[in-house]
Amino acid sequence: MKKYRKITLILLLIVMGMQGVKAQDVGFSQFYANPLYLNPAFAGSKVAPRISLTYRAQWPGLVSAFTTVSGSYDQYIPDLHGGIGAILMSDRQGDHGMLGTTTMGAMYSFRFRVHEDIYINLALQASLTNARLVWDENTMRWPSQTDPSGGFINTSSAVAPDKTSIIYPEFASGVMVYGPAWYAGFAAHHLNRPSQGFYSEDRVPIKYSANAGGLINLSEERRRQSSLGLGQPVVSPNFIYQYQGGFHYFNYGLYLDWMPFLVGVWYRNGIENSDAFIFMVGVQQDYFKIGYSYDATVSELANSTAGAHEVTLGILLPVPEQKHKIKAIRCPSF
């Protein structure tokens, strides 16, 4: 019985996605390991060319219901007075990837100084998304076909949509304000509210994201300039808030960065319910970083979903020669 409850939950979630019912974006736990996804204003924020890779398996207890792979590249271009970036993300839902989306995006972030060591980044992003449905009546099962005692016993009257693949453009914008040891940002995605439903014209709700944090050196020794927190303990408290389609998400916690090790813990919740505790460990060198996080679900879905696993990889390439030294945003990399 428990098995069929899990399958039914998967199908209900997929049907909601097919019909465009308050579709929600994928949520990553290691926000700053996938910075361009959080806010396009992060493009070029590290100055050096940066490659970011993320793999996320959400709710593996539901037959790998949600699997997401993301990759991005960005760097600062002095002649453009800002950073450029590109992101590619693929998301699969359901057994055998029944419902999937692939998004390709490009962005530009203009940077300017407002006061001594205080800077602002303003960014625009354009993306193209392909949503696709694998319609196979031999393997698809619907909630109306289930019987708690006997499994799948009924026939389905579900009708295939006219199109099983749709492509649509979308746009986003963002802003970042930062100083020597603090940062804050705001971003809005799906500004044009594209329709992604296979059966209806329901539109993707705009996603609003706000983030803020700081860096606190626990050692009184003068920090080295070659690498953030090299060999010294640094605590980074941070906060992220997101709103989309009537749903609120709060994520607050901190990192402890003690080169070459990094650990973090956060708590994520909505307004009326708890979601998960997030635990992260990582290893880093000057130009190479890898992290792993686990979402320990504390909501009513805890017994069925088995949380979420996320693995990230970050690579910084050598900085091209520049006439003037450019300051990077000093925020976590995981």
Model regions: which residues?
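Sec-dependent N-terminal signal peptides
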Residues: 4-16
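Subset of outer-membrane beta-barrel
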Residues: 24-334
